[in-house]
Structure formats: structure tokens, C-alpha cells
């Protein structure tokens, strides 16, 4: 039977329509897939940027909490009249819990590292990201006389609430805390909190110039600090440990300030760890200095007064 021209037309029309439908469907599916890929890509980019921000925020939070923790230790010593028994345990308790020996420290209120981490988690939730932190440890060490290194090992899990991406890693956060301008614990403890001395690095290179002791007196009156391998470092001072350290520092105690506060003074070398300690030394008065000022024989050359003893 011969096929009419009209039948052939409708057959081709049907085939063409089918092809159009198929191609349109494929185009739609391709567009839909591309749209989904674009959305996932945006979420992944958002996650990546957020993760970078997390690492910066963690370092910032560790710095702030650590700074406050060291200042809080000074507050504790002043309030309780005792040194920190265990510097590592005490620091961990302070930076994570805001307490020291279970006593609240005002400087740490809403400022612990734990508080900081929880704030990051709350901010992440606002943009549909789930963040979980597990602080494994916090460590402190002093590798140079003028700063303390604080590090924290943290497991971090970051997930998108729509399950488009996830991220899991361990991160070691490190920050350096300058000890400059912290109060020296030795002064706080031994003056019953009446005399404080901020740790300020001495700007003086030569203490005596041609018999002129003006620089020495400036150094003494301000109780500036110099590096000293026979003295304790900052962390040791917080514990009342007066033994020597390669990262030690020392100052000369201005006993005039102790007298002004009605505190009795001792006839001892004014080098802080000796004056506040118990070791026996041979001491000398120095020409042109206050009557109460003495230096032990081991420090005469350091302060350039070998020829000025009386």
C-alpha cells in the first residue's frame, strides 16, 4: 500500500518532535547538573575560605587567651601570696577553664581559648556550616629570654549542613607571647603586692662610661632587665624557681621603692634573684650609689663597676 504524502509528513514531524523533546530534556538535565555543580562549587569555595579564616581566628584566639592567662597568673600571685605550683598544669587550667586551682581569675572571664573556639562554632552555624574542635593539648616553652611560645594541637572537623562537602584535619596552632610589660612575679610575691615591676628590656649598653655611673643609676632606678644565663627565666619566676636558665633575665632591685612602701630591706646584692633568694655572696657597695645598693662579686664586671667598689 502506498504511503500518502500526508502520512510521510506526519511521520517526519513526529520524529522531529521526538528529537526536539529528547534534546530539550538533555539540555535541561545538562543545565540542571551544571547548576548543581555551580552550587556545590560555591559551597566548597565558601568552606575553603571559612577554613582559612578558622586557622587565623584560632591563632588570634590562642594569643589573646595566652596573654590573659599570663597576666592572670600575676593576679593570682598578688591575691594569694603564692607562686604557681605547676606552670604547665596551671596554664592549661587557666587558658581552657578560666580558673587556677579552681579559683576564678577575673581576667579570663569569657576570654578562655575554649570560649574563643565556641564563638567560632556559633558563627559557623549562622552560615550552615558545622564545626567541631577537639583541643588535644596546650603547651608552653621559653626558647628566648623575651618571649614564650604557646602551641595547641587541635582536631578540626568542618561539614556543610547540606552534605555538599566536609573537611577533617589536625592543626598545630603556634603563637609567640612577648613577656614585655608583664609584671615580674618575684617583685609581686616578695613585696606582698605593694611593689610591682614591669619587665622592660634595658635600653642601656654601657653602664659606666669613664667613671660616669649615670647609666647605671638609670638602669637601677627603673629596674630594667638584661639577659642573664645565671638567672631564672619568666616561666621559672612564675613558679618561684630562682635557679639559672639559658633564657634567664635579671634586674637590679630598687630598694628605695621598698622603703617607700614601709617594707624592710636586706643588706644583700640587689640582683633580683639573689636579693629575693637565699644564696650567700660576697657583696660590695658602689661609689656614687645609694647606701642600700650592693652588688655581689660575680656581677661587678657585668655592670662595669670593678673599680668603683667601696
Predicted regions: what they are:
Residues 24-310:
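Long, compositionally biased, intrinsically disordered regions
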Residues 1-18:
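Glycine-centered recognition micro-motifs in short, flexible terminal segments and loops
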Amino acid at each position: 500500500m502506498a504511503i500518502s504524502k500526508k502520512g510521510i509528513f506526519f511521520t517526519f514531524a513526529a520524529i522531529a518532535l521526538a528529537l526536539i523533546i529528547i534534546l530539550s530534556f538533555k539540555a535541561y538535565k545538562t543545565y540542571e547538573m551544571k547548576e548543581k555543580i555551580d552550587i556545590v562549587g560555591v559551597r566548597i569555595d565558601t568552606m575553603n575560605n571559612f577554613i582559612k579564616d578558622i586557622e587565623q581566628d584560632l591563632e588570634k584566639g590562642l594569643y589573646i587567651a595566652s596573654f590573659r592567662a599570663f597576666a592572670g597568673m600575676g593576679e593570682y600571685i598578688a591575691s594569694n601570696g603564692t607562686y604557681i605550683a605547676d606552670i604547665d598544669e596551671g596554664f592549661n587550667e587557666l587558658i581552657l577553664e578560666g580558673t587556677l586551682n579552681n579559683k576564678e581569675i577575673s581576667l579570663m572571664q569569657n576570654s578562655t581559648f575554649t570560649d574563643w573556639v565556641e564563638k567560632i562554632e556559633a558563627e559557623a552555624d549562622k552560615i550552615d556550616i558545622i564545626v567541631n574542635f577537639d583541643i588535644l593539648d596546650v603547651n608552653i616553652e621559653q626558647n628566648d629570654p623575651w618571649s614564650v611560645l604557646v602551641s595547641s594541637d587541635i582536631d578540626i572537623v568542618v561539614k556543610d549542613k547540606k552534605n555538599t562537602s566536609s573537611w577533617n584535619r589536625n592543626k598545630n596552632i603556634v603563637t609567640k607571647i612577648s613577656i614585655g610589660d608583664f609584671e615580674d612575679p618575684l617583685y609581686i610575691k616578695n613585696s606582698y603586692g605593694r611593689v610591682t615591676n614591669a619587665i622592660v628590656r634595658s635600653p642601656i649598653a654601657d653602664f659606666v662610661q669613664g667613671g660616669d655611673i649615670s647609666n647605671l643609676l638609670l638602669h637601677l632606678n627603673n629596674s630594667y632587665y638584661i639577659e642573664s644565663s645565671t638567672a631564672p627565666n619568666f616561666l621559672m619566676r612564675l613558679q618561684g624557681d630562682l635557679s639559672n636558665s639559658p633564657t634567664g633575665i635579671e634586674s637590679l632591685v630598687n630598694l628605695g621603692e621598698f622603703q617607700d612602701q614601709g617594707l624592710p630591706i636586706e643588706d644583700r646584692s640587689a640582683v633580683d634573684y639573689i636579693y629575693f633568694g637565699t644564696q650567700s655572696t660576697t657583696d660590695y657597695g658602689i661609689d656614687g650609689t645609694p647606701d642600700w645598693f650592693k652588688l655581689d662579686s660575680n656581677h661587678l664586671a657585668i655592670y662595669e663597676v670593678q673599680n668603683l667598689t667601696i
